[in-house]
Amino acid sequence: YVSFELDTFWAMRGGMDPLAVMDRLGDRLKLIHQKDFSKTSDSPINLWTVNDPNVLVTWDSFGKGSDHKDFCEIGTGIMDIQSIINKGNELGAEYIVLEQDHTQLTQMESVRISMDSFHKFSGLDW
């Protein structure tokens, strides 16, 4: 069968509940990409509210409704990361990769905040 890697941030931005997507993938989910969505973002969470789902997404239209300020350090935004970790463990996902497309901070400060936050979650092996 086919294994999957899920970016929970982009699943959410695509109007999906990341936990429901994870349930649907079941034990085929092997890797999780985890970002966080800023509490102060003015952008819509669901990008289909500003993009027509019946029109092919192109490189030029991909970013419509998205902004660099939508991204924030892990654990400082609105995503329910502990529930995502719990679901990943329940399904046997092997890895969670922390990822951040953009930051308002220096790269090193961003990494430090995300790692400090991620260490506070349970159900992870370091």
Identify the residue ranges that each predicted region occupies:
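A short, acidic, amphipathic alpha-helical segment used as a generic capping/interface helix at domain edges
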Residues: 76-89
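Short, well-ordered coil/turn segments that N-cap beta-strands
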Residues: 1-3, 28-30, 90-95, 124
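Acidic/histidine-rich catalytic cores of soluble enzymes
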Residues: 1-72
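Charged helix-capping and loop-helix junction motifs
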Residues: 16-20, 79, 112-114
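A short, acidic, flexible beta-alpha connecting loop/helix-capping segment that sits on the rim
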Residues: 97-107
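Residue-level preference for long, well-ordered alpha-helices that form the structural scaffold
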Residues: 21, 73, 77, 107-110
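Surface-exposed alpha-helical segments enriched in charged/polar residues
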Residues: 23, 86-89, 116-119
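C-terminal helical cap(s) of enzyme catalytic domains, especially alpha/beta-barrels
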Residues: 105-126
